[in-house]
Structures are given as structure tokens and as C-alpha cells.
């Protein structure tokens, strides 16, 4: 209700805002210390995602994202270990690129870049990361435990150099980068994905093309949002409708196939 007063297309203060209620489900408020963690399920993600979009309806407008410079990489953040692959990455892409709102693609997300678990705190630059590490130590966690929390949550996970190709420093620079390049760059890089019709990058291009240059473009851009199959576990599903057309989006949040 309060948010709507800010984002209403009729009399709100802003024409668009980012809504992050579903971005840190694993951390307990109000402090959101990295060591103060809680279990979450796809049902929690679905609840937060649906409540925001149902509240906004056709009266407000969101900037929609699953990654930014202050969050871990989405594949590692939202998916179980066994789901961190092509299918999981493209499912997450479809989930948010087809929502009502303006989708934002953060650098590297379109090729499925991953968290970079540095082995030493000396490799991390982010001041918040060092603050959280020191707080964990002060509250009784071992250096190994505190480092593991950093590897999961550090903002530097999303700030490593973009992985252009498999040459030195992932083709980003011939100098010394501000952060170490993720060592997976030899297998995961833009040049390789450009050559692969079944890559994560190719899927992003398809979804963006569907949104911008297809018979569904107007529906995806302007259509209404409504949850679907809300009671189904491990499934995030919604319908978009516009002028007699309907689009059903089904996102399977479990590694196993379902019917």
C-alpha cells in the first residue's frame, strides 16, 4: 500500500522502482547479517514475487531483475546445487524476462556467470564483505566459517571481470584486473556462447526477441499479470493477458522433470 503510493502510474512519485523483497530470502531481517541465515523454499520466492506484482497490478511499474552489483550471481543464489546448469539458468531468465515491468540484464548474467569463491580474504575488495567477515569472527565464527559465508554472499561475486573469451584475464584486459577473474572463464565465456545455438546467451536473445519483436511483444510489455497454479509446489507460474491473447509461463524450480 505504501509502495503503491510511490509507484502509481497515475499519481505516484516515481515512474518505476526496483523491488527487492525477494532478493535476500536466505537472510533474517532486520540486520541481514550474512551469518544469520534461514532456510527458504521456492514457495517463499513465489509468495514475495507474486505479492509485489499483484499489488502493483496495472497501476505501478517495476524494474525487474534477478542480479545486480550488490547481489551474488543468480544461478548460485536461487538454484540448488544440482540445478545450477543450462536448464536452471534459462528457467530463471524466462521467469523474470516475461514479467510485467522493465527487465534489466546485469553484465555477465546473459552468459550465466557464476559466483567466484576466492580462497583468501585478501582477494576481496568490497568493504561490506570485510565488515561482514569481521562481524562473523567477532560473534564466534571461525575464519573458515566466516570465509564460507563471504563466498556465498559477497558483492564481489558479481563484480569480477566480464568473461569475453578464453584468453588471459578472460579477454578483459592485458593489465592487472581489479579482481581476479573467475577461473571458470576458460569454459564459460561470451565467445564460446556466441558459437553455441543452445547456450544461455542464445536463450537470452530468444527471450528478448520474444519480448521486443514478436506477435507476443505487446502482451509481454503491456499485459496484465496473474498467478497460476499457485498451490503447486516448486512451480512458479503466471499468466499474462492482453486484448484477447494469453501467455502461460511455467518455471519448474526443482531439478526433476514434471508434468
Q: Language-model features: where?
A:
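Active-site and adjacent substrate-binding regions of carbohydrate-active enzymes
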Residues: 1-259
